[in-house]
């Protein structure tokens, strides 16, 4: 009886050793480490992983490898989105160009450029409002248009005045800073523009009676003054304007 038990035990031990020797080369994937063989792909047999070392991997559940089909610049395939997460689209760039940037890497603000010019300033260094600049430009343009239309008035250079209009206190013996001869038949004619404290002397050489015309002086927002000859009957007037700067 004891001999039978020993024989059966010996058979069990031998069978167990045989099982261990046959499974010595099997390495479950859970125990894979850096010293174990890496799975390889066999395109001829579609046997994606080595069954000798990784028998617990099911080849039937492995997706087929996306092949290049002869195209250049390999296709990297699509990336799957993990469950429970939403994929966010990448930002679209217009025309394939990056937004304009300064040398420091900061985005340049949009808008119109100033062409490198500084805003106009007053003699004290203060910036003038746009309305003042527009008023000055209009006055200068109007003066230029009037001067272009002036005929040759040199014959009136030494002609005496019939009567005189003045603004402020004008010293008749003082030499004027500016002097010119004019001719007009407009209802309103700009004689001169200047500072708010400038004085003017207007000599009428040829024209209507003094009661038919008058002078008026206005000051713009920027502080400039404008001397206007009021001629409601539109009579032809020839005169001389003298400007005395303050």
Curated annotation (Swiss-Prot):
Interacts with human DSG1. Interacts with human DSG3. It comes from Phlebotomus papatasi. This is Salivary antigen SP32. Immunogenic; triggers antibody response to Phlebotomus papatasi bites in humans. Immunization of mice with the protein results in the development of antibodies specific for mouse DSG1 and DSG3. Exposure of people to Phlebotomus papatasi bites results in the development of antibodies specific for human DSG1 and DSG3 the titers of which are correlated with those of anti-PpSP32 antibodies. Interaction of the protein with human DSG1 and DSG3 may trigger the production of specific anti-DSG1 and -DSG3 autoantibodies and promote the development of pemphigus vulgaris, an autoimmune bullous dermatosis. Residues 65-78, 141-155 have a biased composition (Basic and acidic residues). Down-regulates the expression of CD86 and HLA-DR on the surface of lipopolysaccharide (LPS)-stimulated human peripheral blood mononuclear cells (PBMCs). Reduces LPS-induced secretion of IL-1beta/IL1B in human PBMCs. Reduces LPS-induced secretion of various cytokines, such as IL-1beta, TNF-alpha/TNF, MCP-1/CCL2, IL6, IL27 and IL-1alpha/IL1A, in host cultured macrophages probably via inhibition of NF-kappa-B signaling pathway. Reduces production of IFN-gamma/IFNG, IL4 and IL6 in human lymphocytes activated with PMA/ionomycin. Residues 51-160 are annotated as: Disordered. It is found in: Secreted. One of its GO terms (biological process) is immune system process. It comes from the Eukaryota. Keywords: Immunity, Secreted, Signal. Its main location: secreted. Salivary gland (at protein level).
């Amino acid at each position: 009886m004891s001999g039978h038990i020993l024989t059966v035990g010996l058979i069990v031990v031998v069978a167990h050793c045989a099982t261990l020797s046959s499974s010595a080369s099997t390495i479950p994937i859970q125990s894979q480490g850096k010293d174990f063989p890496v799975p390889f792909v066999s395109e001829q047999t579609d046997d994606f992983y080595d069954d000798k070392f990784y028998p617990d991997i099911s080849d039937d559940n492995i997706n087929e490898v996306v092949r290049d089909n002869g195209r250049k610049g390999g296709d990297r395939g699509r990336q799957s989105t993990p469950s429970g997460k939403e994929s966010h689209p990448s930002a679209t760039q217009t025309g394939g160009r990056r937004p304009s940037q300064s040398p420091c890497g900061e985005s340049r603000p949009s808008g119109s450029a100033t062409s490198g010019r500084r805003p106009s300033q007053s003699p004290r260094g203060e910036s003038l409002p746009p309305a003042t600049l527009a008023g000055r430009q209009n006055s200068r343009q109007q003066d230029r248009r009037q001067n272009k239309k002036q005929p040759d008035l040199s014959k009136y250079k030494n002609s005496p005045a019939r009567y005189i209009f003045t603004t402020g206190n004008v010293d008749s013996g003082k030499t004027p800073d500016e002097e010119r001869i004019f001719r007009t038949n407009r209802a309103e004619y700009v004689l001169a523009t200047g500072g708010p404290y400038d004085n003017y002397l207007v000599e009428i050489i040829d024209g209507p009676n003094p009661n038919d015309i008058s002078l008026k002086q206005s000051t713009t927002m920027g502080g400039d003054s404008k001397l206007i000859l009021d001629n409601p009957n539109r009579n032809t007037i020839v005169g001389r304007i003298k400007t005395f700067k303050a």
